[in-house]
């Protein structure tokens, strides 16, 4: 049995997410890419040089953790080295999406304080977490992939400086899309608020309450397992 047959349902979901990203204008032209680890050494990934809204089942590619194409007719995305870093450094991660949602991307080019590192809305604080800016590296290069290394074990969402967003999740590809949508709505609200005045953050005490709620519900913290002890440490250390 081929991998395309074995993972037919996952490929359908993957394509649905590709189309949703395109419809939401989170990706345009050939921009953005997605990857989903289906087995320890098997990754489903988008091909290079295709609009995500136009990708079909036969365009998808299976690669291993060395970047070798295992199945599929097309070449994998040129950002494959970046994804290999992600999956190699974070054994807990199942899916990753890189895209360019416009309001979130505003913070990738904004000078001054990065407001996405601060707690402003409960849902974003507990589900997405802080979003650090990864220093600029030319797209499709090993340098860009390496620039993530100081951040990978502590966070699950990242802004590539002057480039775009990366979000990863220990769950499936659709959940990662949901996290992008949560963050983009938050970013839109922050951009609107900044045009009117100052941002009001969630207090340390209220973040502690959110942390207690996460523990009660057995929700995982961000970053590699065991790396972060509490939301308070993450936002206020």
Regions found by a protein language model. Give the residues of each.
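Glycine-rich flexible loops
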Residues: 1-237
